[in-house]
Amino acid sequence: SEGRQAWRTRHGIGTGDCAISLFCYEPPALPQWLAQLHAAPPAPQATHLLVTPGRAAATVQQAMASVPATEQGAVTRHALQPCPQPQFDEMLWACDLNLVRGEDSLVRALWAGQPLVWHIYPQHDDAHHDKLDAFLDWLQAPASLRAFHHAWNGMAPASTLPAITPALLKQWQECVQAARLRLLQQTPLIEQLQAFVTEKS
């Protein structure tokens, strides 16, 4: 869309470039993923990694040690500033892949309809593993997206991370957009409540 392209242009992201947003805790697989991303960027023109401030920025700074100096220029890193929610949403809509954390950002990323990876908040008893798998089941995630989630969330070795490619992103986008459509087709909550009250009265 025009708004999406305008956002990308403002941030120096060209047509045909791949833009990836990163809003995470400390993913166990981050060093492996950054090394993989720099060794084989998904876009032939340019790949941009938009890193949110705070924990994501700190963990990326540490993990970049795993990327050989000769490859560090293969991906353009953008250090983002704190921003209000509407601007965060604009970024989600404008990126080709959104790696998000927490439930609020997951919902926002689903509405954006772009490929997404969810870093679920880790719980000490690993209860989040079942929760993540339940989400992936609902999403009807293809095997590659499920494998990425498992490695990203420490449920599988980092070596099992699938490489990000244009074909993979297309498959993931189709999955997310189908899930978004299912949500849009739901009866609005107020109508569900009205029907419930009518049925009980």
Task: Describe each PLM feature range.
Residues 1-27:
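A nucleotide-sugar donor-handling region in carbohydrate enzymes
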Residues 1-9, 35-39, 43-47, 53-55, ...:
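Domain-scale detector for complete catalytic domains at protein termini or as standalone homologs
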Residues 4, 11, 141-201:
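C-terminal amphipathic helix plus adjacent low-complexity
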Residues 25-28, 55-57:
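Short acidic/polar capping segments at secondary-structure boundaries
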Residues 27-36:
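A conserved mid-protein helix/loop that constitutes part of the nucleotide-sugar donor-binding site
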Residues 45-81:
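Catalytic donor nucleotide-activated moiety binding site of glycosyltransferases and closely related
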Residues 84-131:
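A donor-sugar binding/catalytic signature common to diverse glycosyltransferases
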Residues 115-156:
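Nucleotide-sugar donor-binding patch of glycosyltransferase catalytic domains
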